[in-house]
Amino acid sequence: MVFRIASSPYTHNQRQTSRIMLLVLLAAIPGIATQLWFFGWGTLVQIILAVISALSAEALVLKLRNQPIAAILKDNSALLTGLLLAVSIPPLAPWWMVVLGTVFAVIIAKQLYGGLGQNPFNPAMIGYVVLLISFPVQMTNWLPPYEIAATVPGMADTLQVIFTGHTTSGGDMSTLRMGIDGISQATPLDTLKTSLHSGRSVEQIMQYPIFSGMLAGAGWQWVNLAWLAGGVWLLAIKVIRWHIPVSFLVSLALCATLGWLFAPESLASPQIHMLSGATMLGAFFILTDPVTASTTNRGRLIFGALAGVLVWLIRSFGGYPDGVAFAVLLANITVPLIDYYTRPRVYGHRKG
């Protein structure tokens, strides 16, 4: 008889993991479709590039480690990592950026720690932060939503810009980022951060085309509502628990409301925080990662609330417009401590 010595975790249900990942991917469809509608074909191209890169990088590492490639790839975790990173970056970012970010996420942030179940940080957010710090200009080159865009690129222009940096007619990103008012556009949170630093008040900024007649910015409020719909479905079918998304959103809403009441001229309103940027994507699809989140119910409440406070602090006082990725990683650091102090009491033992 031959005994095989394996490292922890000792129990691993491959089929269950694959099914959960697949359900999360299905829940992402409304968010992906809405981003495609408002920002064009670039979102789909980035997803394809990221998924191919993630699967290739994972297969390469598994081969080097003499692990079963096909069996592990079937858990769909690499596919989900690529997808989450792809929908987080600008649709027309250069092709090599999403490849670099995805490869870094899979190899360094996941496989270097031993693979699925052993990584302390969310791999997709590690990849995103590496790209944001290394290439800040390219990572803020979001297109204006089609409803306020002067030019809406088709598939040919999209591919041309992603792979060459220019449209078929010789234009570049500055042309595509032009709004109907002739002014280069950015995301609502980018616009808010830049304009506040220029001395404008929140009331003045709300008159910009990207905010005009909107709760939280053209396109972005619908994107967030779509991710919310997918997240609610995940809750309904019990793929994720309510503790993290609810505590995160309540914490963010509470901080945003208090800040707005005390400084309405310099701090964004609650609806902007709730329905702009990656709020709903983070709440339901990123923070709820079972590997990098707290494992106790009380711990999940603390973990989500902490992330909500961090998002508000970074958005309001930090150097980056959207703080979801940094908040997730900072909250990941605290998980061992949170789990230690929130672990259930063992019956028959006194509290020590």
Swiss-Prot record:
Disulfide bonds: none annotated. It is a multi-pass membrane protein. InterPro entries: NqrB/RnfD, RnfD_bac. It is found in: Cell inner membrane. It is an enzyme of class 7 (translocase). The modification FMN phosphoryl threonine is found at T187. GO terms for cellular component: plasma membrane. Its EC number is 7.-.-.-. The chain crosses the membrane at residues 20-40, 42-62, 68-88, 89-109, 123-143, 217-237, 244-264, 267-287, 301-321, 322-342. It comes from the Bacteria. The keyword Electron transport applies. Keywords: Cell inner membrane, Cell membrane, Electron transport, Flavoprotein, FMN, Membrane, Phosphoprotein, Translocase, Transmembrane, Transmembrane helix, Transport. One of its GO terms (biological process) is electron transport chain. The keyword Disulfide bond does not apply. Belongs to the NqrB/RnfD family. Part of a membrane-bound complex that couples electron transfer with translocation of ions across the membrane. Required to maintain the reduced state of SoxR. The complex is composed of six subunits: RsxA, RsxB, RsxC, RsxD, RsxE and RsxG. This is Ion-translocating oxidoreductase complex subunit D.
